[in-house]
């Protein structure tokens, strides 16, 4: 007879009328009982003949592709002019005094950020914009191209001008070496002084003035430079190591654009007169530059190499035959849907190519991309705006994958210990947080996005003209692309983009100037940055609490008036560093803070309402006695795992599901197991904040017996049969908790200390989790454990009771600065201007 839910509850000791714990609990460790229960609940039955279920509620599993929805009315979000101040460390020091080592190290990491992949795979330009929406290919092409253009205009991307130069908009940083008329301009910066512009083969600045060529040779392989391109390193390697910016002006050569050939550049750029950096002059000269003048000094043409004449250098002078778009003007219409009808609407379609305000030198960058892009909804709640998805997954796959640095994410208990208090809270929203952090230009060749131009994009989609790939500029197949579909799409897009259609129909290659979202390094850098900023804020306002996770910043203060004045001060400070906040998204939470999916108040933490709603929905839709595909189980476990710490039995209750996912087998929910989980998740208990205290109850065990020291009382017992040592220690801890009621226990077992009971026999893990919920553990070495003797059957010998203090930990949550205490038992009427006198130090 299958096990009923009531019987199962009784078995797990979740009912009050269970027998004495010392007899009942060891039974749950019995392998035979665990196996029988698993069979009764149909938990481990992988061989099912019924077809698997691949969808449960909103969770989809194997063989199901979620079709993304294209929205023709997507708006491209606006990006403010984000420019993080380069002297951020000095500004912080002026604000709060000397920075700690940790804060300094973190801020140096992102000024500028560096990226060194082991291997970079270059893809053809046609793969620049992914054909994610085949029905709306042209529309998607232009919307994506507009998004990229917006990012370039906002100073977030570089535009590849030639193999060795790029242009960008916005304010330059000191590590971006300026080019004027294909010539380097040296600026002195307060950060590096003159040593920062040692000429190197790759345009990477070395930190030290000594021997940059040696460094550049070391870095060549990581930057993907071939040995023959390091011509500078080769030419100068015979000389002494110390090359300063103004030491040998006569032997100096610049490789700003193309390193090949005998073209020697005039050395006046290195003379001190041209060091003055005049932005206004540069802008005017740029606007009159034609692409013909942008040829390299060595006489090599420097436009895209692998691209047909559609983007050849002469086009901005007005030669029509170089531009695919303008060729239609002089050709006869081929039908009523010929593109020439659209192109003849305008006399002046504007420039073929736009150039940025600044031109800089970059390492050799091929006319390729390293990742594809496409658009999706900004988030599930905002479908009117688009978000750019960049696929740089090549850096986290395969044998040459980059191992991203690990960083600490606060766990639930640490978070609760830290934030559960009676403070008033508000959260700040950093707009486009990732795009605040500047990347070194040396990373550009690895992070390239772009598009091959409309003609090749359309040709790739229509298989007929795919063969004549090499002759796209020629007249005979100019009209191959004319179709009703393309004509109608372009006419509609003309309303939105106007003359820009021409600009967007040209090929372009862009590299990231700020950190992109699709690279594993970015979350790490963002976490380092915001935690350093919060650390500075905490030290500037010692009677408040500031905390961050990624781009989510929260501020807490004793009263609402205090919080408002803190908010004003912190906002002004962040804006002075160049951090853009989104004022519309500032949320005031009162006393219960919503953060990282939790609601955290003085009583502890619980999952947010929308997660509770999802849980209810999940159980409503969960089928019984039907095998569910393991991929769906993975998604169910993702949701249930988030809320597991708030249930009686915690993670151990989900172990059967974990096991089936690991074995990649289907899982069948029996009515009893579903009812058990359902009851677990419909009554959630808050996770409370741990309190400091003295440990006066100790537990210890041997495989055959257990012993407790409760104050001056000693208790011992034996097991019916010998048990594995970890199981015995866990049982002893449960007995100590149930006999004494103490919520701080001393134990010498690391597994019990870790509070992860998923590796124990299933029934025991579930029961122990419930008994030990809310218990804090202190480590006591075996030699000092007062419960050691009773566990070995010796009751007469009394070791002295230790005075073992328990201090709640906030984990590695980057609280390097001392933070104030926020004891919730203080009266609420603390005057808001008075810093509290009790300072709390992280353990």
Swiss-Prot record:
**Record's domain comment?**
Terminal protein domain (TP) is hepadnavirus-specific. Spacer domain is highly variable and separates the TP and RT domains. Polymerase/reverse-transcriptase domain (RT) and ribonuclease H domain (RH) are similar to retrovirus reverse transcriptase/RNase H. The polymerase/reverse transcriptase (RT) and ribonuclease H (RH) domains are structured in five subdomains: finger, palm, thumb, connection and RNase H. Within the palm subdomain, the 'primer grip' region is thought to be involved in the positioning of the primer terminus for accommodating the incoming nucleotide. The RH domain stabilizes the association of RT with primer-template.
One GO molecular-function annotation for this sequence? RNA-DNA hybrid ribonuclease activity
GO BP: DNA replication; symbiont-mediated suppression of host innate immune response
Q: Which residues form the Reverse transcriptase domain?
A: 357-600
Q: Which family does it belong to?
A: Belongs to the hepadnaviridae P protein family.
Q: Which UniProt keywords apply?
A: DNA replication, DNA-binding, DNA-directed DNA polymerase, Endonuclease, Host-virus interaction, Hydrolase, Inhibition of host innate immune response by virus, Inhibition of host RLR pathway by virus, Magnesium, Metal-binding, Multifunctional enzyme, Nuclease, Nucleotidyltransferase, RNA-directed DNA polymerase, Transferase, Viral immunoevasion
Designated name of the protein:
Protein P
The miscellaneous remark of the record is: Hepadnaviral virions contain probably just one P protein molecule per particle.
Sites binding Mg(2+) sit at 429, 551-552
Chain residue ranges for the region called Terminal protein domain (TP): 1-177
Specify whether rRNA-binding is a keyword of the entry: no
Q: What does this protein do?
A: Multifunctional enzyme that converts the viral RNA genome into dsDNA in viral cytoplasmic capsids. This enzyme displays a DNA polymerase activity that can copy either DNA or RNA templates, and a ribonuclease H (RNase H) activity that cleaves the RNA strand of RNA-DNA heteroduplexes in a partially processive 3'- to 5'-endonucleasic mode. Neo-synthesized pregenomic RNA (pgRNA) are encapsidated together with the P protein, and reverse-transcribed inside the nucleocapsid.
Site (Priming of reverse-transcription by covalently linking the first nucleotide of the (-)DNA) found at 63
Domain of life the protein comes from: Viruses
What InterPro entries would the database entry show? DNA/RNA_pol_sf (IPR043502), DNApol_viral_C (IPR001462), DNApol_viral_N (IPR000201), HBV_DPOL (IPR037531), Rev_trsase/Diguanyl_cyclase (IPR043128), RT_dom (IPR000477), Viral_Replic_Matur_Polypro (IPR051320)
């Amino acid at each position: 007879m299958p096990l009923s839910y009531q019987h199962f509850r009784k078995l797990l000791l979740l009912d009050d009328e269970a027998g004495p714990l010392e007899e009942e609990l060891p039974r749950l460790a019995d392998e035979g009982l665990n196996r029988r229960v698993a069979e009764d609940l149909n938990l481990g039955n992988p061989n099912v003949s019924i077809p698997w279920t691949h969808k449960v509620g909103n969770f989809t599993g194997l063989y199901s592709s979620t079709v993304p929805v294209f929205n023709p009315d997507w708006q491209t979000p606006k990006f403010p002019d984000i420019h993080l101040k380069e002297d951020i460390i000095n500004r912080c020091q002026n604000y709060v005094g000397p920075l700690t080592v940790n804060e300094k190290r973190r801020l140096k990491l992102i000024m500028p950020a560096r990226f060194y992949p082991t291997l970079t795979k270059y893809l053809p330009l046609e793969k620049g914009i992914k054909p994610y929406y085949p029905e709306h290919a042209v529309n998607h092409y232009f919307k994506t191209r507009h998004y990229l253009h917006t990012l370039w205009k906002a100073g977030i991307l570089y535009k590849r001008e030639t193999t060795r130069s790029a242009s960008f908009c916005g304010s330059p940083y000191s590590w971006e070496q300026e080019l004027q008329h294909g010539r380097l301009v040296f600026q002195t910066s307060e950060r590096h002084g003159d040593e920062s512009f040692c000429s190197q083969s790759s345009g990477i600045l070395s930190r030290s003035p000594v021997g940059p060529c040696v460094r550049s040779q070391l870095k060549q392989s990581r930057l993907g430079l071939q040995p023959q391109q390091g011509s500078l390193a080769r030419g100068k390697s015979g000389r002494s190591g110390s090359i300063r910016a103004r030491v040998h002006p006569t032997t100096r050569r610049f490789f700003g654009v193309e390193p090949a050939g005998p073209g020697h550049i005039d050395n006046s750029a290195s003379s001190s007169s041209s060091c003055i950096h005049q932005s206004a002059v540069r802008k005017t000269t740029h606007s009159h530059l034609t692409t013909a003048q942008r040829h390299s000094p060595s006489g090599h043409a420097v436009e895209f190499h692998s691209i047909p004449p559609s983007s050849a250098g002469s086009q901005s002078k007005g030669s029509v035959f170089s531009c695919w778009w303008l060729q239609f003007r002089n050709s006869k219409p081929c039908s009523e849907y010929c593109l020439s009808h659209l192109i003849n609407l305008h006399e002046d379609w504007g420039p073929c190519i736009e150039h940025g305000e600044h031109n800089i030198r970059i390492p050799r960058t091929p006319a390729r991309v390293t990742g594809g892009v496409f658009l999706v909804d900004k988030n599930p709640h905002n479908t009117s705006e688009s978000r750019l998805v960049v696929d740089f997954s090549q850096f986290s796959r395969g044998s040459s994958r980059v191992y991203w640095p690990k960083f600490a994410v606060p766990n639930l208990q640490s978070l609760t210990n830290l934030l559960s208090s009676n403070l008033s809270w508000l959260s700040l929203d950093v707009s486009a947080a990732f795009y605040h952090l500047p990347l070194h230009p040396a990373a550009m060749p690895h992070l390239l996005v772009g598009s091959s131009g409309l003609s090749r994009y359309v040709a790739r989609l229509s298989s007929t003209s795919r063969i004549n790939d090499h002759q796209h500029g020629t007249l005979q197949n100019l009209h191959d692309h004319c179709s009703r579909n393309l004509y109608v799409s372009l006419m509609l897009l003309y309303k939105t983009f106007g003359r820009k259609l021409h600009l967007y129909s040209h090929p372009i290659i862009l590299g990231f100037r700020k950190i992109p979202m699709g690279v594993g390094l970015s979350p790490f850098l963002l976490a380092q940055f915001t935690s350093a900023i919060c650390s500075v804020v905490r030290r500037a306002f010692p009677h408040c609490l500031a905390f961050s996770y990624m781009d989510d910043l929260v501020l807490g203060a004793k009263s609402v008036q205090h919080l408002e004045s803190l908010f004003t001060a912190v906002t002004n400070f962040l804006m002075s560093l160049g951090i853009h906040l989104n004022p519309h998204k500032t949320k005031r939470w009162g006393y219960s803070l919503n953060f990282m999916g939790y609601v955290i108040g003085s009583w502890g933490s619980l999952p947010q309402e929308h997660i509770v709603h999802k849980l209810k929905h999940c159980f409503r839709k969960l089928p019984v006695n039907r095998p569910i595909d393991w991929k769906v189980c993975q998604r169910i476990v993702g949701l249930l795992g988030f809320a597991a710490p708030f249930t009686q039995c915690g993670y151990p209750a989900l172990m059967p599901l974990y096991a089936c996912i690991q074995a990649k087998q289907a899982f069948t929910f029996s009515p009893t197991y579903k009812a058990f989980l359902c009851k677990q998740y419909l009554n959630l208990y808050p996770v409370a904040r741990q309190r400091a205290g003295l440990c006066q109850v100790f537990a210890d065990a041997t495989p055959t017996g257990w012993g407790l020291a409760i104050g001056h009382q000693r208790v011992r017992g034996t097991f019916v049969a010998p048990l594995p040592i970890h199981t015995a220690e866990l049982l002893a801890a449960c007995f100590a908790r149930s006999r004494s009621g103490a919520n701080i226990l001393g134990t010498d077992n690391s597994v019990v200390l870790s509070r992860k009971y998923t590796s124990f026999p299933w029934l025991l893990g579930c029961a122990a989790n419930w008994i030990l919920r809310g218990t804090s553990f202190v480590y006591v070495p075996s030699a000092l454990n007062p419960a050691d003797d009773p566990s070995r059957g010796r009751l007469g010998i009394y070791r002295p009771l230790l005075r073992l203090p328990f201090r709640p930990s906030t984990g590695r949550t980057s609280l390097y600065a001392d933070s104030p205490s926020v004891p919730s038992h203080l009266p609420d009427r603390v005057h808001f201007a008075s810093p509290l006198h009790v300072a709390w130090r992280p353990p």
